[in-house]
Amino acid sequence: MPLKGRLGLETARVPHADRHGLMWLERGRLAVEDGNLVFTTAGFDDLEAGAYDIPYQQVSNILLGPGGVVSHDALRILARRDTGLLAVGSKGVRLYATSMPFGPDSADRARTHAELWADEETRVDVAREMYQIRLGGELPSHQRDLDSLRGIEGRRVKKVYQNLADQHGVEWNGRRYDRNNPDANDTVNHAINHAVTAVYAAARIAVAVTGTVPELGFIHESSGHAFALDIADLFRSSTTLPIAFRATKKVERQPGRDIEPTARKMAGATLRDEDVIPDMIDQIKDLLDRES
């Protein structure tokens, strides 16, 4: 198939090639033709069906979504150029594989991350900064006990839940989730679970492409993706919970709709339209790229 166009970072035809050099591709085959990296697609979002050159020299990571396949030669070219490849759900609502997230050609940020985490004082400093973001304001300088900060945030989140319930006209009886009997949860709690899963996947993508250390969380511990949980929580009030309550209201207005695909699709649209993953990357850089 002859090339129909050039898939560049500055073209409006590719809405997901963002300021961090992330290129989103779906419904097509990434392969090498005549020495060039080419994506042949059936079309998705604003991109018409056709074959497109990929300017991999300008791309930091390719995020390959549903319907995407990649050839061995394409993997070889990407590896040679230190261009990452991640297999993701539509618009980043899932992360399936990070086999080639080479990240920045430097260990500086990972080293800084580890150093900040290893020192008890700086670990608390970063955790406090995260709580400031989550709480939307400055904290008293003497407030360094994380348990008390968790209590403050817990009270604030309860208000966020109620405000969103009032705003969208959704009945709210509290946050509940029975892992042993998930079907017993009400619609809005199901929606929150699905929104949390999507935003957490977005945070894992942001952690992968920044070359930071997933296991080293400043607030969360034990999980192999503790840092992604930290980052996802920074967007709970602004992104995750609004998705859940909007999805719940949509299902209530249209009986017969399933909350899981509704919440997932709404999450994908939000991640794309509000540049959530680029914002997460910026947030990671702001937290870790600090003056020593």
Feature locations, PLM:
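Glycine/small-residue-rich interface belts in oligomeric ring/scaffold proteins
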Residues: 41-46, 50-106
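Short solvent-exposed loop/turn micro-motifs enriched in small/polar/acidic residues
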Residues: 22-23, 47
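Short, exposed beta-strand/loop patches in secreted or surface proteins that constitute
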Residues: 29-31, 54
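Active-site helix-to-loop segments that bind/position phosphate- or nucleotide-bearing substrates
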Residues: 1-21, 27-28, 35, 80, ...
